[in-house]
Amino acid sequence: MNIRIGHGFDVHKFGGDSPLVLGGVTVPYDSGLIAHSDGDVVLHAISDAILGAMALGDIGKHFPDTDANFAGADSRVLLKHCYQLALQKQFVLGNLDVTIIAQAPKMAPHIEAIRQCLSADLQTDIDNINVKATTTENLGFTGRKEGIAVEAVVLMKSQ
């Protein structure tokens, strides 16, 4: 069996009046995230991790923010496209580990819904999906509640 590891990282700034969507789940909060697409920073980091594991570049290459076709794009559609590229290379998700870095909103009430959404979108058992959240103890831009950062690591295995 061939295995590959991918790492993804993304950051978005709070702003605007669009809803806050994280991992495909709408999370109640004062503000959404500023982005060319729907701003789902969780799905962007995961998409980058999958593309990285497959040596296919990053989401900016596949969905450039200069392309009006992707304005307001549903990040679940983008994630599914990235996963399809892995499937075409005969790779499936072994496991996924996501860290959401945010002072606010509190993520604990939303973690299981995010895991369920990711499990469905990535066609894998929920036991292969881990999502956790941490703060930066009021330090840096996330600590000042200016935005959210996410790291994602995937293990992809050949079929």
From Swiss-Prot:
Keyword Transport: no
Gene behind this protein: ispF
Keyword check for Phosphoprotein: no
Biological classification of the source: Bacteria, Pseudomonadati, Pseudomonadota, Gammaproteobacteria, Alteromonadales
Recorded metabolic or biological pathway in which this protein acts: Isoprenoid biosynthesis; isopentenyl diphosphate biosynthesis via DXP pathway; isopentenyl diphosphate from 1-deoxy-D-xylulose 5-phosphate: step 4/6
Molecular-function annotations in GO: 2-C-methyl-D-erythritol 2,4-cyclodiphosphate synthase activity; metal ion binding
Record function comment: Involved in the biosynthesis of isopentenyl diphosphate (IPP) and dimethylallyl diphosphate (DMAPP), two major building blocks of isoprenoid compounds. Catalyzes the conversion of 4-diphosphocytidyl-2-C-methyl-D-erythritol 2-phosphate (CDP-ME2P) to 2-C-methyl-D-erythritol 2,4-cyclodiphosphate (ME-CPP) with a corresponding release of cytidine 5-monophosphate (CMP).
Catalytic activity from the UniProt record: 4-CDP-2-C-methyl-D-erythritol 2-phosphate = 2-C-methyl-D-erythritol 2,4-cyclic diphosphate + CMP
Cofactor: a divalent metal cation
Positions with a binding annotation for 4-CDP-2-C-methyl-D-erythritol 2-phosphate: 10-12, 36-37, 58-60, 63-67, 102-108, 134-137, 141, 144
Entry protein name: 2-C-methyl-D-erythritol 2,4-cyclodiphosphate synthase
Subunit structure: Homotrimer.
Swiss-Prot/TrEMBL site (Transition state stabilizer) positions: H36, T135
Keywords: Isoprene biosynthesis, Lyase, Metal-binding
Record PANTHER family: 2-C-METHYL-D-ERYTHRITOL 2,4-CYCLODIPHOSPHATE SYNTHASE, CHLOROPLASTIC
Binding residues for a divalent metal cation: D10, H12, H44
BP GO terms, sorted: isopentenyl diphosphate biosynthetic process, methylerythritol 4-phosphate pathway; terpenoid biosynthetic process
CDD domains registered for this protein in UniProt: MECDP_synthase
